Amino acid sequence: MSKQRIERVDSLPLIVYWLTKMRIQEAIDAIWQPHPYWQGLSYGQLAVLFVAYVLYTHTHRLCEMEDWLNSHRTLLEKLTGWRIGVKEATDDRIGHMIEIIGCEEEKAIRLQRQVGQNLIQAYALPTEIVRYDTTSFSVYHTVPENGAGQGILGFGHSKDHRADLLQFKQGLGSLDPAGVPLFTNTVGGPCADDPLYLPAWEEMVKTIGHARFLYVADCKAAALLTRATIDHKKGYYFVSLTHDWRNS
């Protein structure tokens, strides 16, 4: 006698629909191909399921995803059209997928660029104004054996006034007024903010396809090199000038 069970639907159809519309799977699978002996879903398919899991459960704990996936497996198979095995989402498989996607910065930037272009084209998003800003995140962590500053975590100027804590920095470029993210980058805690603004602008130019947008940023983007380069490449910027830059 077959067993019957109930699977909750909730917001999963909406989440999967938008991830499909953004073509996340196609963008990832075009850049990363799994090992020939890799079985089951592709990296792109696993990534879609992982993002759906994070958005649905509001957690990113890998150890719980296998049970979550199996409790929604029939629904997810209907929504995606994929055959999802019972062991597709073990923590080692998901961890391997995340490691592969995150270990090469150049490919990760290509992914951001492709997804950003898909969003702009699919929804005809306005690209007249783009914002970029950075922030720091303090963490309770032991100092790495090779010393602070050798990796992402390091000591630096803390906006939280906690010079005793290690930190890393995160930058985000987004479209106004919708706030749609186009570019993000993670850098080491000791890194200064000023040198990040020009590479971020150049990357968003590649994503949008031209430089004819207004680049809005804070005074750390007011360095003469940053402003001169944007102007030379026919771009526009709107930044606040500190006292040191008013005469430059």
Per-region residue spans from a language model:
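Short, solvent-exposed loop/turn segments at the edges of secondary structure
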Residues: 165-167, 232
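Short beta-strand-initiation
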Residues: 167-169, 223
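Carboxylate/His-rich catalytic cores and anion/metal-binding grooves
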Residues: 157-161
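Dynamic "connector" segments at or just before major functional cores
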Residues: 1-152, 164, 171-190, 198
